[in-house]
Amino acid sequence: MVDEVIQSIERQVQKEKFARKLGLRLIKAEPGYAVVEMEPQEELMNIFGMTHGGAIFSLIDEAFEVSCNTHGTVAVALSVTVTYHRAPDQKSKLRAESVEIHRSAKTGTYEIKVTDERDILIASCTALCYRKKEKLPFLEKTETGG
């Protein structure tokens, strides 16, 4: 079942228009864990020519979204606290790694780190999700052949 959940999430991320628009790529997903990368794009630069904080937040949020939903039930964000440590180099690919540090029946806590290609810390985040008691809707479609 775990493999089916991960594969279904991977398919959903590939279809997610927002992720495609930002160039977000899911690199790895496991229960409670995800790695997402983003290539630098001119469209994502701020007025100073650096990757916009909103784009970095979106990278964090994508990794968080994947990691907290890998258990097969719908999980939604309750709180996301981001600290920006430094601006990335203009041409550096960014990588967000989300790690589950606590999970209960109702909530999950995740630490997400964004690093550049030289493994320099760009941003860090602590995020809390609420776990609903419903299966991921796209899993039901897979199980029924839809």
Could you tell me what each predicted segment is?
Residues 1-146:
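Terminal targeting signals and extreme-terminal segments of soluble enzymes
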